[in-house]
Every structure is written in C-alpha cells, then in structure tokens.
Amino acid sequence: MMALLLEPLQFTFISHALLISLVVSIPCALLSVFLVLKGWALMGDAMSHAVFPGIVLAWILGLPLATGAFIAGVFCAVATGYLKDNSRIKQDTVMGIVFSGMFAAGLILYIAVKPDIHLDHILFGDMLGVTIGDIIQTMIIAGLVTLVISVKWRDFLLFSFDYQQAQVIGLHTRWLHYGLLCMVSLTIVATLKAVGIILSISLLIAPGAIAVLLTQRFHIALLLATGISVIVSMTGVWLSFFIDSAPAPTIVVLFAVVFIMTFTVISFNARTKGNAHRQDLLSPN
C-alpha cells in the first residue's frame, strides 16, 4: 500500500508538480481570505483573464512573460479603479467590461502573431512541464507576497473590514488598495505555469471561502485557508497521477468538492441546532 502511495514520487515531473503546487498554494490561500472578506472575488477573476494580452505582448517584445503578465494585471486593476471613480457605473460592471475586453484583445494578438507558446499552457497551465527555473521564479514571487502579507496583515485586515475606519486612523488606504491588487497580480503570475490564467481564480477564492465557512476568527481563517490549500493542491497532483488526469483541473475539482461538502455540513449542523433549540422552547417545563 505504501509503495503504491509513493509510486508517483519516482517520476521527476510529479515531484516538480508537487513542489510548485505547494509553493503557489500558500500565497493564494493568504490572499484568498482578504479577497473573500473584501468582496473582490470578481476582481481576482478579472485580473487573471486580463494578463493574457500582457503575456503575448511580452513574447512579441522579447521580455519575460511574467513581466508582461504582471504589468497587464496592474493595468487592469488601475483601469477598473479609474473608471469606477469617474463614472456612475458600478465596479462589477466595469470589471466585466475591462477583463473581457483585455482577454479578447489577447486572443486577437495571439491569433495575429502566432507565438510559439501553446495556448492551452497559457489558459490551463503546464504543471507537469515545470522546470527548476520555473519553480525558483515561483518561489521568489510567492515568498515576496507571503512576506508582505505577514508584515502588513493588520493594515490589510482593517482595510478589508472597515475602509472608513482605516482612513480615520491615518492608514494610506489608496496604497493598501493598489498594494493588495499588485499582490494579486503577482500571485497570478506565480500560478501561470502551474494552473494557467483560467483556473488560477479557484486557488485565489476557494481556500478563503472554505475557511470563512469554518471560522469567524481572522487569524484562524488564514491558518485554515493555508492548510486547506496545501493539502488540496498536493492531493490533486497526487490523485491526477492515478486517474490519468491533468493536475490543474483535478485540483480545482477537489476545491469545489471540499467547498460543497463544507457548506453542506455547516448548513446541516446549523439546521440541527436550530431544530434542537426550537424543541427546547416548545417542550413543557
């Protein structure tokens, strides 16, 4: 039995996939709690799609793809904020227009220049094809994001929960706003090789959503989200070996299953406690 469980580790590509899934799962989990509490789930989705034209432009200009992706992600965030602040249109509407427009522009560029980057690898990642260089680059980005969150988490927490109070006590809310968006963009860049731009939104939302269902304490939510993200990501890679599937979609499906199971159990427990309390009220003394 143990030999069967350890069988995937005999292959270098599986070891690399497990390592990069571990690396990207930590910053994704930490950010996911802030995104869920702030109500920025759609912003993460928008930025993950918006990096596509940046990747193609970076290839055309001979720049690192990660650089183009990061710049495009930041541009999406800035453009969304500017349009929201200078029009009567709500933020979710602006995000829908900006990210769909940028994604479509990326597709037009991709078809026009026909780069030697496989479209599937951009959209869905190539976790089984990662190199040591990819892992090192991802570790640097993930380490930077994790460090910033570890140092400034209290400021980001107040910014996410009570924007007005953050302004009153003198926090630079604009810097916190764009700083958080820059970290989301960096994290999306880190996940590109692993899960691609389409599936990265799951890693940026699911861990925080599951953790918030389980606890109302912020620091515990951070720990739970990180643990859930690491376990689900690595389990997805390991499971994909035995079911002959791609690791990235397997990870996303596992996140969906865990979320549904958690929601079902929490709802059932709440309903059971409510019924028990009602019976206590109705029972004769």
What are these regions (language model features)?
Residues 1-26, 274:
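Membrane-interfacial amphipathic/re-entrant helices at transmembrane-helix boundaries
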Residues 198-249:
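Transmembrane alpha-helical segments in multi-pass inner-membrane proteins
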Residues 4-16, 87, 91-154:
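Transmembrane helix-bundle core of multi-pass membrane transporters
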Residues 33-115, 211-223, 240-242, 267-268:
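Short loop segments and helix-boundary regions at transmembrane helix junctions
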